[in-house]
Amino acid sequence: MTFLQLCQRLRAECQDIGVGPASVLSSAPRDQIYIQAIREAWLEIQLLRPDWTFWPDDLSYTLTAPQSLAVDTDVPFIPEQYHVAIVYFALGQRALSASSTELVEKHNQLWSRYYSMLTDRYTGSVIVGVSPMPTSNNDQYSVGEILAQ
């Protein structure tokens, strides 16, 4: 989805009357609400975790230089199946601004689903309870013994 399509999708998810924005360069106040929400959501998602592995190989965007959406045809660099995650993240901001409990609930349910998919795919594996045991003269020490030394 393009930046413009993401903005239009957010407006539809918010069940706002009408269509639009027609362009992300629109200066209409109502359009700017959706444009800014999508722009900020994508920046926040990129900066949400320092261990994301979705950054492009060419290093065109990084944690210290994230992608900013600016024109209608800009496309977030993550695979298209995850683009709607940006919409659902932005929906949370809009839901709070509109004081809509229905939209807050929709945001909570859908963003948590997409966040789980993103973290499953774009963060490293977590291994719990496995650590190498240091040896000394071929003797193994327990963690408690190591801490006592």
Label every model-predicted segment.
Residues 1-78, 120-130, 135-149:
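Conserved short "hinge" loops at termini or chain/domain junctions
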Residues 17-24, 95-103:
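Inter-helical turn/loop segments and adjacent helix faces that build the functional surface
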Residues 19, 100, 108-112, 129:
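Generic alpha-helical propensity signal that fires on short helical segments
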Residues 32, 102-105:
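Short, solvent-exposed positions on alpha-helices
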